[in-house]
């Protein structure tokens, strides 16, 4: 066991070196040995994944014991922070070497040959290194896109090609991290929330919630112990939003009314919480007699126009969402005194404004139909 832990120590140092200028001294033989070392650890991952004591010992070493004072510094090598990462440590090593300009030409050529050996016999039970490398590159691309492409404005976010790409990458990543541990997707989303531009991340989540379910890859169908429902990626997003009240409040405040209506129609679990937020926002407003409008006490309060637009959008949704919204408004109106006169209850005024808007819309549609028949 101690020999295995020492082997892990040495590989962690090797992985740290792979991003430095020290690789300029590597020749093809060094690259080959490094990859063999990485593949051995991948074999360890596959062999001892269900062996509790060995897995625990390796996890403990990865977290605490495999960085020596006076070496490359304390803390885990990025990308190799847990036992699950051993399953693709050859991919991590290859990607670091490919990105390191200090690697010599001969060593780089040998690395590329190892990654893309050409046609030949393939182990049917193993994913090829180039496929794993491509998958990891997609993950990095997803984070890069989420971080640096948040400033495009498009009124129809759900149709924006860039947003849809980011959403699909996010769902795919959630599907991958969910295989290792049930709680990992939530932690992954929380880390993205802390690291990425938050407004853009919220938009990507909304678009992801409108995407069709991801199809499962053939090898996933054969893997024991993995039970994926078709919409699990979107369900993870829904549960994460509902479990983080501040994030969900920001989600509802930052996104356009029409997009939120689409999302809450698709995912009914979100609609009661969204309606609760709208109710809270409405209760913060008071009627200004001089201006003749409902206004907020503080600058962050939602203005009347926005509140009206959000309720109006929800009332244009198909049942049962539309019915729930109207019932909620009628309930609030009754609890507030059931007034019919404007200016006394914001719920009365909202219902009057919504009915007036619906009446005008019917008038316009009727006029258009009449003109078309002339």
UniProtKB/Swiss-Prot annotation:
Q: Which InterPro entries match?
A: FANCF, FANCF_C_sf
> Which locations, inside or outside the cell, does it occupy?
Nucleus
Q: What is the effect of changing residue 289 to A?
A: Strongly reduced monoubiquitination of FANCD2
GO-annotated cellular components: chromatin; cytosol; Fanconi anaemia nuclear complex; nucleoplasm
- Subunit text: Belongs to the multisubunit FA complex composed of FANCA, FANCB, FANCC, FANCE, FANCF, FANCG, FANCL/PHF9 and FANCM. The complex is not found in FA patients. In complex with FANCA, FANCG and FANCL, but not with FANCC, nor FANCE, interacts with HES1; this interaction may be essential for the stability and nuclear localization of FA core complex proteins.
Disease linked to the protein: Fanconi anemia complementation group F: A disorder affecting all bone marrow elements and resulting in anemia, leukopenia and thrombopenia. It is associated with cardiac, renal and limb malformations, dermal pigmentary changes, and a predisposition to the development of malignancies. At the cellular level it is associated with hypersensitivity to DNA-damaging agents, chromosomal instability (increased chromosome breakage) and defective DNA repair.
Q: What does this protein do?
A: DNA repair protein that may operate in a postreplication repair or a cell cycle checkpoint function. May be implicated in interstrand DNA cross-link repair and in the maintenance of normal chromosome stability.
Protein name from the UniProt record: Fanconi anemia group F protein
The organism encoding this protein is Homo sapiens
Q: Which taxonomic lineage does the organism of this UniProt entry have?
A: Eukaryota, Metazoa, Chordata, Craniata, Vertebrata
Q: Which gene encodes it?
A: FANCF
């Amino acid at each position: 066991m101690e020999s295995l832990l020492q082997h892990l120590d040495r590989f962690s140092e090797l992985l740290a070196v792979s991003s430095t200028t020290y690789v300029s001294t590597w020749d093809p033989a060094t690259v080959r040995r490094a990859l063999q070392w990485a593949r051995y650890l991948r074999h360890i991952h596959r062999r001892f994944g269900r062996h509790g004591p060995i897995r625990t010992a390796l996890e403990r070493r990865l977290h605490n014991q495999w960085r020596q004072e006076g070496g490359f510094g304390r803390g885990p090598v990025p990308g190799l922070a847990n036992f699950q990462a051993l399953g693709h440590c050859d991919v991590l090593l290859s990607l670091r070497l490919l990105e390191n300009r200090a690697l010599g030409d001969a060593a780089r050529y040998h690395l590329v040959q190892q990654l893309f050996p050409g046609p030949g016999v393939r182990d049917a039970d193993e994913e090829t290194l180039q496929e794993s490398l491509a998958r990891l590159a997609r993950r990095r691309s997803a984070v890069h896109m989420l971080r640096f492409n948040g400033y495009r404005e498009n009124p129809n976010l759900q149709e924006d090609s860039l947003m849809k790409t980011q959403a699909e990458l996010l769902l795919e990543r959630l599907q991958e991290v969910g295989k290792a541990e049930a709680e990992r997707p939530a932690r992954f989303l929380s880390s993205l929330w802390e690291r990425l531009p938050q407004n853009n991340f919220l938009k990507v989540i909304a678009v992801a919630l409108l995407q069709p379910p991801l199809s499962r890859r053939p090898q996933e169908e054969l893997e024991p112990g993995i039970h994926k429902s078709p919409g699990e990626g979107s369900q993870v997003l829904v549960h994460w939003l509902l479990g983080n009240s501040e994030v969900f409040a920001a989600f509802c405040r930052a996104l356009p009314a029409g997009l939120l209506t689409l999302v809450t129609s698709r995912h009914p679990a979100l609609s009661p919480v969204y309606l609760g937020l709208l109710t809270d926002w409405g209760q913060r407003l008071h009627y200004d007699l001089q201006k003749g409008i409902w206004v907020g006490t503080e600058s962050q309060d939602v203005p009347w126009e926005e509140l009206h637009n959000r309720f109006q959008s929800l009332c244009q949704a198909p049942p049962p969402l539309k019915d729930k919204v109207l019932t909620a408004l009628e309930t609030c109106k009754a609890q507030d005194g059931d007034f019919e006169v404007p200016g006394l209850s914001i719920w009365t005024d909202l219902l009057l404004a919504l009915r007036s808007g619906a009446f005008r819309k019917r008038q316009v549609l009727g006029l258009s139909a009449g003109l078309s028949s002339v």
